[in-house]
Amino acid sequence: MQKSTPPEDLSRLTLLGREAKPSRKLETFPNRHPDRDYIVTMETAEFTCVCPMTGQPDFADLHISYIPDASILESKSLKLYLWSYRNEGIFHEHVTNVILEDVVAALSPRWCKVTANFGVRGGISITVEAEYKKPGWSKP
C-alpha cells in the first residue's frame, strides 16, 4: 500500500492552497481505506450565522462526524463552506440540518452526524443534533 497521498487525489481540489473566501462548495478526495469503518470528526468553535429575525450573531461549536464510504471531506473546503454562513439569517435547527444534507450530498458517507452547540441567547442554549445513516448500512 502506498504511504503518501497520490497526486491524482489532489487533482479535483480547487480550494486548497488558494485564496480564502466563503464558498458553498464542499470538496472531497478518495478514501484509501473504503474496506474499513472509521470515524472522521471535524470540529470548530468558530461557526457563526445570524438570527433571521433580529440579525444578531449566533455562535456555535460545531462537530461533524462521519464514517466515509468512497470519499473524504477536504477540511479547507469545509472551513470556507462554514464561513459562508457568517451573515446568513437562519435558525439553528435549520442550519444544522442543511449542513448535514450538504455534507451527505458531497460525501455519500455510510453515517454522518452534525452537532451544533449554540451559545446562550436569552438565557437558553440550544444544541441541535442531526444524523444520517446510509440505507442498508448498520453500525457495527
UniProtKB/Swiss-Prot annotation:
SUPFAM superfamilies: Tetrahydrobiopterin biosynthesis enzymes-like
Signal peptide extent: none
Gene Ontology biological process terms, A to Z: queuosine biosynthetic process; tRNA modification
Catalytic activity: 7-aminomethyl-7-carbaguanine + 2 NADP(+) = 7-cyano-7-deazaguanine + 2 NADPH + 3 H(+)
Record-listed E.C. numbers: 1.7.1.13
Active-site residues annotated for this sequence: C51 (thioimide intermediate), D58 (proton donor)
A Gene Ontology molecular function term of the record: preQ1 synthase activity
Subcellular localization(s) per the UniProt record: Cytoplasm
InterPro entries per record: GTP-CH-I_C/QueF, NADPH_dep_7-cyano-7-deazaG_red, QueF, QueF_type1
Alphabetized HAMAP family for the sequence: QueF_type1 (MF_00818)
Family: Belongs to the GTP cyclohydrolase I family. QueF type 1 subfamily.
The protein, known as: NADPH-dependent 7-cyano-7-deazaguanine reductase
Gene from which the chain derives: queF
